[in-house]
């Protein structure tokens, strides 16, 4: 029988003294290593857009073998890996299309979600094509959405995960700040626009972290690993405007392996 997330913690605390008393006899039989049942949900930051090496069977979802979920699964022998994250996914897409493999046997779930609900692509398009005033107005609209509408949408997703897999460890990962302010970029967006974009990233991370914590989920802050590797840093782990255009403002292969993967490793 699998225990609930809270019950498992309590049982571990109760079991520790018993193991101390009977450790010698318990050590006679080495425990069998159990395979981890891992489901990776979310949007393009989880599917690995921008990292290359896409699984052709994933189509427009662009699931990459260089994404942090695929790298985590490959480095943990015996992992049963279900990869349903998809480029462009919103919270409603997770609910409608991605949760099938999440069940009472699931051990680990990871997810990035919310950026597309808040208008990530449209915001960055506006900022690059319409100038500072339009950019700042679009960012303000996105930040209002993040504060007023996104929390309830995240709750729906997190409630669904918790209901389907009450004993699973759930790791919710955030988004990196895009820009190093005062950095090396001589052209492109204004510094004011860059600062506003970073502030919006901080907003969505704060909202996501709060909703995750309220569900008993871990939150992984990737700004700890991306620091010094933002756009305009001289050593970015994010694509700037590039071709194919969908790679723009997404993690590179280094962003996945050195930015996201260490955060998931730390949480698990």
Curated annotation (Swiss-Prot):
Main location: secreted
Disulfide bond positions: 61-86, 127-135, 185-232
Cellular localisation: Secreted
Thermal behaviour (record text): Optimum temperature is 55 degrees Celsius at pH 8.0.
Active-site residue numbers: 44, 250
Signal peptide: 1-34
EC class of the enzyme, as a word: hydrolase
Listed InterPro entries: SEST-like (IPR037460), SGNH_hydro (IPR013830), SGNH_hydro_sf (IPR036514)
Induction of synthesis: Expressed once the cells enter stationary phase, with a maximum at the late stationary phase.
GO molecular function, one term: triacylglycerol lipase activity
SUPFAM superfamilies, per the entry: SGNH hydrolase (SSF52266)
EC code(s) of this entry: 3.1.1.3, 3.1.1.-, 3.1.2.2
GO biological process, one term: triglyceride catabolic process
Field pH dependence: Optimum pH is 9.5.
Keyword field contains Transport: no
Catalytic activity, as annotated: a triacylglycerol + H2O = a diacylglycerol + a fatty acid + H(+); hexadecanoyl-CoA + H2O = hexadecanoate + CoA + H(+)
Activity regulation field: Inhibited by 3,4-dichloroisocoumarin and tetrahydrolipstatin in the absence of substrate, but by phenylmethylsulfonyl fluoride (PMSF) only in the presence of substrate. Several water-miscible solvents enhance the lipase hydrolytic activity in vitro. Tetrahydrofuran and N,N-dimethylformamide (both 50%) inactivate the enzyme with t1/2 of 5 minutes and t1/2 of 2 hours, respectively.
Matching PANTHER family: LIPASE 2 (PTHR37981), SGNH HYDROLASE-TYPE ESTERASE DOMAIN-CONTAINING PROTEIN (PTHR37981:SF1)
Subunit structure as annotated in this protein's UniProt entry: Monomer.
Similarity remark: Belongs to the 'GDSL' lipolytic enzyme family.
The protein's role, per its UniProt record: Catalyzes the hydrolysis of p-nitrophenyl esters, alpha- and beta-naphthyl esters, and triacylglycerols, with a preference for medium acyl chain length (C8-C12). Shows a much higher hydrolysis rate of glycerol esters of unsaturated C16 and C18 fatty acids than that of their saturated counterparts, and a preference for cis double bond. Is also able to hydrolyze several natural oils and Tween detergents. Also displays thioesterase and phospholipase activities, towards palmitoyl-coenzyme A and diheptanoyl glycerophosphocholine, respectively.
Protein name: Lipase
